[in-house]
Amino acid sequence: MALDILAVAPLYQGPDINKIRLMAETTKKSTTPPKPLTPSRTKLTTIETKRIMSVLDETIHKVELVTLLSNVASSSQSLEGMLGEDIMKAVREHVDLCQTLLDHVNYLQEEEQRLQEEEGFEDEPWFRDLVFSIELQKSRLPPLRQQIRESTKNVLRLLLRNPQAASLLQVQSLGRSEEAQSFIDSLVELRGFLFEKLLTSPMEARDKTQFIQDITRRNRRNQEIIDTLENELAACMRNRDAEVEKENFVVQELKNHLHQVLKFSENSLLRTKQEAEKQQKADFRASQARVAKIQQEILLLRSQFHNLVMENREAEQALRKKKYKVETEIENWIQKYDLEMSEKQDEYEELDIIHKEEKLQLEELKQRHSVLVEEFSQIQAEREIKAKERLEAEQEMVRMVRAATLIQALWKGYLVRSMLRSKKKKRNKGKVKDKEKGKGKEKGKGKGKEKGKGKEKGKGKKGKGKK
């Protein structure tokens, strides 16, 4: 499958201006560069950002798996037992479809190249048949691409169902092509950029834009300075060219003078050459005598070398015997170490089994503890509800008692007022009767009063009963 690789052009670097001294006035403004802004947060907090990052991570994981399918097809014999028959079958079908697509594309390229070469035969029937066959082949490409998409989804579905196979496939990362690896690196770089973008708050984004604007202004000022420096450099270059022309003129004059000097010095050169030849002959005779002496020294050194070799051979034999003895001791120590390590391995396995059993018991105890905690929370909630109900009942009882006392007080006041009114009425009636009957009926009046008192007592008893 073809991968589109996006290349990023390198940043522009301005001309390097060296060896130029500037004399500028010091300004009162601070020239400290603004500090680069970094996000204050290090983790994603919202669900949407986490979902975005999880989707991008899953996409990168799927791309890593898809770019290794061609390597799996080429090494199918070594991976067939590890990945499973279903996955290998799906991979073979996917590779066959990709190969078919590549064959169609190559065929179309060849036919189009043939059409370009034979543009002068457009009116011929065979040319039209060729164009029709090319269009027919192009119409077959979209269904084939759709089949490749479906097969890719099927292979990814099988690999995601089997995490062990996916991890085993990711180990084969050396089989990935350079284009695919660069594409994955671009996706990882995009993930880092998106992660930093999601961590940046609106306030930080505003600060970042302000930071970029400051950098832009500084860059503009620096560009103006660079332009002025380039103008100064051009002026300096012109001055230097003028000086170079002057120096070239001086050099030419010196060359002419030197040529004249060489003509005059040829005779002196011949004389010095003859003297040098004489000196060379004398040195040659002296060197021959020196060579003979050196050869005698070489013979002496060779005899000494032979004697040293014999001595070193005897020492080498003794060292070899010592080495053999040390090697046997090392082998014995290695065997002893292997026995001790096997015993410790058995002991470690037993302790591992005991650790696993205790871990299972700990899990059971944790489950029981969680159940007891839930029951305790339920009981605590029920107690709180009952306490609230009891408090409400007590408050209701207090309200009822207060209402009863108030009703009793009102009823007592009503009875007292009614008794007082009845007494006043009876007294008024007695006075009227005394005036009519006269003084002779005082005894009857006394009896009437006694009867009135008896009635009042009866009413008092009835009032008490009502209370």
Curated annotation (Swiss-Prot):
It is found in: Cytoplasm, Cytoskeleton, Flagellum axoneme. Residues 422-467 are annotated as: Disordered. Gene3D superfamilies: 1.20.5.190. The keyword Cytoplasm applies. Belongs to the DRC10 family. Residues 400-429 form the IQ domain. Keywords: Cell projection, Cilium, Coiled coil, Cytoplasm, Cytoskeleton, Flagellum. Component of the nexin-dynein regulatory complex (N-DRC). Interacts with CFAP52. Residues 458-467 have a biased composition (Basic residues). InterPro entries: DRC10 (IPR042815), IQ_motif_EF-hand-BS (IPR000048). Residues 431-457 have a biased composition (Basic and acidic residues). It comes from Sus scrofa. Residues 334-382 form a coiled coil. This is Dynein regulatory complex protein 10. GO terms for cellular component: ciliary basal body; cytoplasm; motile cilium. Component of the nexin-dynein regulatory complex (N-DRC), a key regulator of ciliary/flagellar motility which maintains the alignment and integrity of the distal axoneme and regulates microtubule sliding in motile axonemes.
